UniProtKB/Swiss-Prot annotation:
Keywords: Antiport, Endoplasmic reticulum, Golgi apparatus, Membrane, Sugar transport, Transmembrane, Transmembrane helix, Transport. It comes from Arabidopsis thaliana. This is UDP-xylose transporter 1. Disulfide bonds: none annotated. Residues 327-342 have a biased composition (Basic and acidic residues). The gene is UXT1. It is a multi-pass membrane protein.
């Protein structure tokens, strides 16, 4: 029971860390890109991953965690896939309207549910599907303003959805099947994610912004915000792997939409961004969907635990009489042996 409570506290801690760090990095990057004019998102992400790897390497050398070797091919392919998915999401934003980009992010949940159902035989109850539907409708109402389609943008969005879904499912599957921690997986895959983004980032950013990251004027305040962004990113990357490993890819996506609602609310209240009753209604519907999802998942988890416990007790009841009978027969045999002339 104590172990179960400790596990629940670990999950809550991971969720809180993910929300706090993600909202913080959005605020930091908004200031960096909007106010200070630094538009190189893909290159910045490669720096995030480099700093994450360096931080974890120092932690490893100081014996904060134990490294567990993972098959190199698995790590390389996993790292490259995650790096490509980040690049595709950025390209999708560049080729599509903001509204269609938001639709792309919303589509990740149903695609993840579909893939886990088809390939991992995972079951999602109708109640959980309904709560996810409410969540997606709410976030859609709150954040989607325009939907402009084009062929290249649509193809990039589909590729971004596919790579993101597969990458997040693998993040969960690798941790469970290879029995590695989120820290061990991130430590070994981060260099490959960083490498592909470091090489492709300047080209992607130049194509999207028509600016060169190497000729940008790096004032002290810009360098300060980049450093802060990289430090927060360590927590973001760590908590991402932690949440997906402890919960599921779908739960991580639900958490992502909670962050979206918090960022929107932050913009409305503190930055005085324009908002309408539609935005507020969308956020409320999304929050209701999240609460229902959390409740239904909790009920399903308790039901599964109770079923597991009852099965275990049932097995005990089945085996006890047999053991008793075996001992009794053994005792009778001993008595016969004593009186036997042989």
């Amino acid at each position: 029971m104590g172990e179960m409570k400790s596990m629940q506290m670990g999950v809550i801690g991971a969720l809180f860390l993910s929300v706090a760090s993600s909202v913080s990095i959005v605020i930091c990057n908004k200031a960096l890109m909007t106010n200070l004019g630094f538009p190189f998102a893909t290159t910045l992400t490669s720096w995030h991953l480099m700093v994450t790897y360096c931080t974890l390497h120092v932690a490893y050398k100081l014996n904060f965690f134990e490294n567990k070797p993972i098959d190199m091919r698995t790590v390389v392919l996993f790292g490259l896939l995650n790096g490509i998915s980040i690049g595709l999401l950025n390209l999708s934003l560049g080729f599509n309207s903001i509204g269609f980009y938001q639709m792309t992010k919303l589509a990740i949940i149903p695609f993840t549910v579909l893939l886990e159902t088809l390939f991992l035989n995972k079951k999602f109850s109708q109640k959980i599907k309904f709560s996810l539907f409410l969540l997606l409708v709410g976030v859609g109402i709150a954040s989607i303003t325009d939907l402009q389609l084009n062929f290249v943008g649509s193809v990039l969005s589909l590729l971004a959805i596919a790579t993101t879904c597969v990458g997040q499912i693998l993040t969960n599957t690798i941790q469970k099947r290879l029995n590695v921690t989120s820290t061990q997986l991130l430590y070994q895959s981060a260099p490959f994610q960083a490498a592909i983004l470091f090489v492709s980032g300047p080209f992607v950013d130049k194509y999207l912004t028509s600016l060169n990251v190497f000729s940008f004027h790096y004032s002290p305040i810009v360098v300060g915000f980049i450093t802060l962004s990289c430090l927060i990113a360590v927590s973001v990357n760590f908590s991402t792997f932690l949440v997906i490993g402890k919960t599921s890819p779908v739960t991580y996506q639900v958490l992502g939409h909670l962050k979206t609602c918090l960022v929107l609310a932050f913009g409305y209240t503190l930055l005085h961004d324009p908002f309408t009753p539609r935005n507020i209604a969308g956020i409320l519907i999304a929050v209701l969907g999240m609460l229902l999802y959390s409740y239904f998942c909790s009920v399903a988890s308790k039901s599964k635990q109770a079923s597991s416990d009852s099965t275990f007790l049932g097995k005990d009841r089945d085996t006890t009489p047999l053991l008793g009978q075996e001992n009794e027969n053994h005792h009778e045999a001993k008595k016969l042996d004593k009186h036997s002339p042989v």
